[in-house]
Structures are given as structure tokens and as C-alpha cells.
From Swiss-Prot:
Gene Ontology biological process terms in this record: cell division; cell wall organization; peptidoglycan biosynthetic process; regulation of cell shape
Pathway per the UniProt entry: Cell wall biogenesis; peptidoglycan biosynthesis
Reaction equations catalysed: UDP-N-acetyl-alpha-D-muramate + NADP(+) = UDP-N-acetyl-3-O-(1-carboxyvinyl)-alpha-D-glucosamine + NADPH + H(+)
Function: Cell wall formation.
Protein name in the entry: UDP-N-acetylenolpyruvoylglucosamine reductase
PROSITE patterns xref list: FAD_PCMH
């Protein structure tokens, strides 16, 4: 899609011109370092700007995609048509009573660290999750026995019509690595986490232990999308992949990690196509060997490259 001067001018009036980028490479904004170009990449600085961008996209019938920190996401090599919005400039975190409130663009790691600084327990599990707060709600992110569902009290969202609503955690239908946010078309603006007062040294001890486990077991030296597959009932995805002798398997620059079989790393300037093909190869091999269908935890969006 060629971006018209009219659309560019309209978006530049909503936010500053420096926040509107045409033909922006999405790989520069994802943890996997994969993905083609966004027709328009925009980073609003207020909730009202978010509303106005959505309303403009609806009025002009322009496709619209929300992008978080890109930590659990693969964007195809053909990129994304229309408007891609990132809330990285809405990243404030603060305390109110025994609650931590964080804007969507803040990293969930930083929300966890703020809770530690305020001697509030409950977000320790998130100390190693690299995604944004909005992305964490989108997929009910979790690790080491904890998940967003355990601590989320409420959230402020923008609807696909551009209206602001406050929702309780129950209204998001949070479940294992899922929510109703994508189906409803909500855009998360901020989240309120209900925590408990605790001794900061005890909180730090838990976080240090989880950080050690993460750093010792995960291939953090290479770009990746984190855990690729959901945990199948009765199994562990990483163990199935390991027992299928897939560790070290490569397609192009993508490789099944030798350190943690549940990770696929971008070891040598992989394309999104190579990365996705390796995911499919792993799924096919595990299915044939064990009869287990591995379901992706990572989202894949965008268009295939033009041949």
C-alpha cells in the first residue's frame, strides 16, 4: 500500500511528524530481528492520540495493526500493510496504595522492578519477561508458576471504534497464554496490578533466583521470540523437541537452540520465512514421532514476500 500525502498529513496532525515513519523496517522493533516494512509506523504520545489514530484508520478504511515490544511475535518478510502503531512512548509506571499501575508501552520487567522498589510482592514471575505491559495482557504472559491473571485487577483499553473503557481482569477472559483482547480488538492503554506488601529483600531473593534460572537455561545471546510453543497437556514442548533430536537443526539462519530446545534463535541473519519454516518442521517432526501437535505460543502476522 502506497501511503498517500493525505494520510501522512492527517497522522502528522494527530501526533508530531517525527512520530510518523513511512516504510519502516519492523525487524528494527522486534526481538527476533525479523520482518519486512510497515507502510506507516506511528508512536503516539497520549491516549487521545491513540483514539484519534484509530478513528482516522476507520474513517479512511486503512488496515490497522498494534505492535508491542515484539518479543513474542514474528512479522513476515512481506511486512504489514496500513498503519502499525507502537505505544513505546506511553511507558510510565507508578504506585497507588498497594497497586502498581503501568502504561501499555512499559516493559513488564520494569513493572516488576518498580514493585520490588516499592516492597510490593506478586510480580516477581515477570522479572525476566521481555515484553510490554500491553503484550503481557494480550497473551496472559507468565513464567515460573505465575501469570498476569494472578495479579491483574483492571485495565484501561481503547475499543476498535476508538472509545476508552475500563475493564476488570475477569472481563478479559484470561487463560493459559490467551485473552479476548485480540478478538475484541482492544488496545491496552494501562494496567493496574493488585499486589501485597512484603519485605523487599525477600522479593529480591525470589527475583534473583528466577533471573539465574532464566540466564542459565535460555539462549539469551541470540535474538529469539522466547518460548515458541505452548505447553501441551501432559508434556513439555522442549522435552519433546529434544527427544526428537532437533536441537541444532537449522534452516537458513534460524536454529533450534542447543541450549534450550523450546527456543528457536536467529543465529545468522535469518529471514522470517526461514524462521517460520523451521517452526513448521519442528511441529511436523514432533507430530510424526510422538503424535503430539505443538501449538504456537508466538504470533505470526504480516504478509508473505512477493516472489
Amino acid at each position: 500500500m502506497k501511503v498517500s500525502h493525505h494520510l501522512y498529513d492527517q497522522l502528522s496532525r494527530i501526533t508530531s511528524e517525527e512520530n510518523v515513519m513511512v516504510d519502516e523496517l519492523i525487524r528494527n522493533h522486534t526481538y527476533t530481528k525479523l520482518g519486512g516494512k510497515a507502510d506507516v509506523y506511528i508512536t503516539p504520545e497520549s491516549y487521545s492520540e491513540v483514539q484519534d489514530i484509530i478513528k482516522l484508520a476507520n474513517k479512511e478504511d486503512v488496515p490497522f495493526t498494534m505492535l508491542g515490544n515484539g518479543s513474542n511475535l514474528i512479522v513476515k518478510d512481506g511486512g504489514i500493510r496500513g498503519i502499525v502503531m507502537n505505544l513505546q512512548k506511553l511507558a510510565s509506571i507508578w504506585r497507588e496504595e498497594d497497586k502498581i499501575i503501568a502504561q501499555s508501552g512499559a516493559r513488564i520487567i520494569d513493572a516488576s522492578r518498580t514493585a520490588l522498589a516499592e516492597s510490593l510482592a506478586g510480580l516477581e514471575f515477570a522479572c525476566g519477561i521481555p515484553g510490554s505491559v500491553g503484550g503481557a495482557l494480550y497473551m496472559n504472559a507468565g513464567a515460573y508458576g505465575g501469570e498476569i491473571k494472578d495479579v491483574l485487577e483492571s485495565t484501561i483499553v481503547v475499543t476498535k471504534e476508538g472509545d476508552i473503557r475500563t475493564l476488570t481482569a475477569v472481563e478479559l477472559d484470561l487463560d493459559y497464554r490467551t485473552s479476548n483482547i485480540p478478538d475484541k480488538g482492544y488496545i491496552v492503554l494501562e494496567a493496574t496490578f493488585a499486589l501485597k506488601k512484603a519485605n523487599s529483600s525477600d522479593i529480591k531473593e525470589v527475583m534473583d533466583d528466577l533471573t539465574y534460572k532464566r540466564e542459565s537455561k535460555q539462549p539469551l545471546e541470540y535474538p529469539s521470540c522466547g518460548s515458541v510453543f505452548k505447553r501441551p497437556p501432559g508434556y513439555f514442548a522442549g522435552k519433546l523437541i529434544q527427544d526428537s533430536e532437533l536441537q541444532g537443526t537449522q534452516i537458513g539462519g534460524a536454529e533450534v537452540s542447543k541450549k534450550h530446545a523450546g527456543f528457536i534463535v536467529n543465529k545468522n541473519n535469518a529471514s522470517a520465512t526461514e524462521y517460520i519454516n523451521l517452526i513448521r518442521h519442528v511441529q511436523k517432526t514432533v507430530s510424526e514421532k510422538f503424535g503430539v501437535q505443538l501449538e504456537r505460543e508466538v504470533r505470526i502476522i504480516g504478509e508473505d514476500p512477493v516472489e
